[in-house]
């Protein structure tokens, strides 16, 4: 039963039912169990990403990071890399957008054209933008913080978290049943995470089913709820819940016919 797998992700979680409650349909059972489950899966992702962000903040406060000297910064980031198993790249960027990665050193590309970069220069943390990494080509989730010295932004530290590795981590840690489909949509409806790697970073319109487009619109418009739609000739029911950390909508679905 789905609830058994949920307990692997969230210790101590229980769902109480009154002894006199009327019998529920299989669809009702799925909706109740899935609502607990999707919030558990969301918690795994939020905990991981917030942990990466916290670690970056700690690194950004060090004298080595604030020095702006790559060799000094690299030592700090190398230690960070050892504790993150979902990263595609760990990097230090300068205000002009030039950057170095722990894996490759100086990069030929520049980050100044990234939509999130002005926020870093303004002294703001960044969590959740979806990009195809310039240095690795992997579909990645940006987690980054500014580095300041004497009140001035002198650079930024970032981790490009691989979407596929993060999705796999959730599935493995929670022992997710094979008949369930988990995905997370960003504010535009793009799939930040997906159990099926081929659908990561794609929009519902890319799949071409109008009922999925309508269901996605409903998901994006609400904090929590249930939808149904057709995909590849099958009817699918899904429950969803919003992450306060990223703003993503986490969706757990199952085919019913």
Describe each PLM feature range:
Residues 1-13:
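N-terminal secretory signal peptides and thylakoid transit peptides that target proteins
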Residues 20-69, 82-86, 125-126, 139-142, ...:
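Juxtamembrane extracytoplasmic/periplasmic/luminal helical "stalk" adjacent to the first N-terminal
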Residues 47, 51-54, 80-99, 125, ...:
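Short N-terminal helix-loop-first-beta-strand/juxtamembrane motif that initiates sensory/input modules
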Residues 69-84, 156, 160-202, 209:
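Solvent-exposed, extracytoplasmic
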Residues 81, 92-109, 196-201:
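Structured interaction and signal-relay segments at domain junctions
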Residues 99-173, 221-235:
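Extracytoplasmic/periplasmic ligand-binding sensor regions of membrane-associated signaling proteins
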Residues 106-108, 134, 198-201, 244, ...:
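Short, surface-exposed beta-strand-loop junctions and turns on beta-sheet-rich folds
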Residues 207-257:
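Extracellular/periplasmic juxtamembrane segments that couple receptor/chemosensory ectodomains to their
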